[in-house]
UniProtKB/Swiss-Prot annotation:
Annotated ranges, domain EF-hand: 1-32, 33-68, 70-105, 106-138
Keywords noted in UniProt: Calcium, Metal-binding, Repeat
Record bears the keyword Calcium: yes
A Pfam cross-reference name: EF-hand_7
MF (Gene Ontology): calcium ion binding
Residues that hold Ca(2+) 4 according to the record: D119, D121, D123, Q125, E130
Family to which this protein belongs: Belongs to the calmodulin family.
Job of this protein: Calmodulin mediates the control of a large number of enzymes, ion channels and other proteins by Ca(2+). Among the enzymes to be stimulated by the calmodulin-Ca(2+) complex are a number of protein kinases and phosphatases.
Binding site for Ca(2+) 2: D46, D48, N50, T52, E57
Protein name in the entry: Calmodulin-beta
SMART domains: EFh
Entry GO terms, CC: myosin II complex
More info: This protein has four functional calcium-binding sites.
Length: 138
């Protein structure tokens, strides 16, 4: 997957991509780096500072980025699965199901408490931001 994406943006086939193309490559792989993050990643791997990145450097960079975002993406996917109507909210019952499927062994009381804490406006539903905050707070 990475080699195909890399090759797509290695226009002249010389084994390097320009830093300008990096953002496009990463977005095609489902990443969404900020400009600052792109510059940081480029600086980390572009040893000679010539503005191009070879494939081994690219793999190193993607491995770092994906390790950072893996758990967040897993949470995002879990949220999508149980947000049945795709409206950006999950119900309390759906949340209970999500927690069970993520391997959390919680009592009903514990789940109810999490729902109360996460459900800021008290409408019985939890939006994505609230869900992520709940799942990542320990």
């Amino acid at each position: 997957e990475f080699k195909e994406a890399f090759s797509l943006f290695d226009k002249d086939g010389d084994g390097t991509i320009t830093t300008k193309e990096l953002g496009t490559v990463m977005r095609s792989l489902g990443q969404n780096p900020t400009e600052a993050e792109l510059q940081d990643m480029i600086n980390e791997v572009d040893a000679d500072g010539n503005g191009t990145i070879d494939f081994p450097e690219f793999l190193t960079m993607m491995a770092r980025k994906m390790k950072e975002t893996d758990s967040e993406e897993e949470i995002r996917e879990a949220f999508r699965v149980f947000d049945k109507d795709g409206n950006g909210f999950i119900s309390a019952a759906e949340l209970r199901h999500v927690m069970t499927n993520l391997g959390e062994k919680l009592t009903d009381e514990e789940v109810d408490e999490m729902i109360r804490e996460a459900d800021i406006d008290g409408d019985g539903q939890v939006n994505y931001e609230e869900f992520v905050a709940m799942m990542t707070s320990k």
